[in-house]
Every structure is written in C-alpha cells, then in structure tokens.
C-alpha cells in the first residue's frame, strides 16, 4: 500500500483537466520523491513497482508518464530513488529551455500563430519569441469541453502577447489567417504519429488544406519507444448535457504526413524518418 501523501498526488494527477503531459510528469516525479521520504527502505522496492504502474495508469495516452516510470529504478535505497527523480526533473526543465529556443527561431516578425489546447511547451516557445522582441499574434481555440485554451489566453495576457480566442468549430476558417501552426503533444508514437487533445487532427487537416506549416512541440521524453499508432488507447470521458449523453474522446491521433516537423530539445525532427 502506498503512503497517503503519494496517493493524494496520484488523485491530484487524475483530477487535473487543464495541464498536460509536462505537468503530469513533474507531479509523477514528485510522487517518487515523496515515496523516498515516507517509506522505510525495507518496503521501498515493492512500493516503487506499484507506483510505476499507478503513474502510467493516470493517463496511458501520455508517454511522459511511461518514460518517467522506466527512468525510475527498482531499488531499496532512498538516496538512489531521490537522485533519479530529481535528475528526471532537471532534464525536463533543461529540455524545455532548449526546445523553446529552437522553436522560437521558427517565429518571424508579423507571424500569426494558431494553436489548440494548452501546452506549457508551446507557451514557452511563444514567450521566448516575445523575449527576442519578435512581434506576432496568436490565434487559439477555446478547446472545449475543458476550455484549456482559456488558460492559455490568461497566460498570454499576463505576458503581454496579442491573441484572439476562437471556438473550436472555427479552426478551419481562422487557420487561413495563420502563417504557422504550433501545438503540443502528449505522445509521439514509435511510427511518428501525434497523440494530443482531440481537435489536433482537425487543425492539422485544415492547415494541410491551406498550406500552413504545422509543427508539433514535444520534448524527447514524450516519445514512446515501443507503442505504435494503432495500439494507442484513447481515454474517453462522456458528458451529460440536458439529459443527453455526449461522447467525449479526450485525444486524437494525427498522422505524421500532416506534420512539417517535431520541435525537440535536440532539434527539429521529421517523422517518421528521424524517429524510427
């Protein structure tokens, strides 16, 4: 049985509706740090194995959780567990900084960026471009039904970045005004497909039809080493509106052929050539 403090972190991860793969991976690493603080070393190995399973179960569509679980060794030493969890967090922050620097190079003065959902990685790219004195505008979808786009809008407003919020249904219309699309990712599959908030596929199709370059921002810890697109389990959380059940699949899968490139901390990779 995992300690109550660890279980509470897992519950917090499961409750979260807005923040994405990076936030969940960070909370997962914090769960392992808490485990190191709470348990006697004689109980540690079994608890680590249990927590590795539970972390992945929080959201099987997020490769960051799978890779975190793989990164943490089964050990009876608290110092090793703590060291590995901290190292994962350090690598996460370093990767985001490097990726943001690379991604900001894609943004030119006068650009109109279109995005979907909330990605802390995409936000970091946009902020970095702003710090480099580039002038641009962001079009963002409200991203229903959880409205992650409104969270992004607040962050952009705080950073003094011009933006416009649209309904999801208008992404095909407004992408014509964009010069570049950048979205985040919850997983890049082994065969180069992009798993992200439902609606990402539609935006990619609209951009393809209108010759708008479509980029995905994903640190390498969001790349799944074994899972292919046909094996992805997409979570579903149905809604009830006026006594009517509405299907609500949380994620979709975008084929690599619609992706101009994947921005990583190691550079821009072209799927599936650079992933296989």
Curated annotation (Swiss-Prot):
Entry keyword set: Initiation factor, Protein biosynthesis
Record has Methyltransferase as a keyword: no
GO molecular function: guanyl-nucleotide exchange factor activity; translation initiation factor activity
Pfam families according to UniProt: IF-2B
Family per similarity comment: Belongs to the eIF-2B alpha/beta/delta subunits family.
Quaternary structure and partners: Complex of two different subunits.
Function in brief: Catalyzes the exchange of initiation factor 2-bound GDP for GTP.
Protein's UniProt name: Putative translation initiation factor eIF-2B subunit 2-like
Protein's organism: Pyrococcus horikoshii (strain ATCC 700860 / DSM 12428 / JCM 9974 / NBRC 100139 / OT-3)
